Curated annotation (Swiss-Prot):
Entry GO terms, CC: cytoplasm; prefoldin complex
UniProt subunit comment: Heterohexamer of two alpha and four beta subunits.
The name this protein goes by in its record: Prefoldin subunit beta
Keywords of the record: Chaperone, Cytoplasm
Pfam families: Prefoldin_2
Gene3D superfamilies, sorted: 1.10.287.370
A GO molecular function held by the record: unfolded protein binding
Amino acid sequence: MAQIPPSLQDLVNRFNQVQAQLQNVLLRKQQYEAELREIEKALTEIEKLPQDAKIYKSVGNFLIPQNRDAALQELRERKELLELHTKTLARQESLLREQIEKLREEINKELSRLKGSVETAKGGG
């Protein structure tokens, strides 16, 4: 069986690394999106409450009382931060997908080139 040329092995290694980075980005993005949905639900429910409603915030194993406006402000700030992170991850996802496509093309070119040189060697021998 023929040895895989180092150039092709490098391309495959880079492809696998970028693929792993993409999986990591997708996982983090999914986690942020899930947290965003939870925050949006919480905002909707808290906004329905009267101004003097008792609200508790979970901190570790404790429930800490918090006023409605402070809870809303904290949730809105967290939502804004998560939206920013999600947009950043979406850009990273797009760039990584482009890199994967370029690497896939390079790998296919290298494989075609190798296949051609093997067939030439067999036919010329």
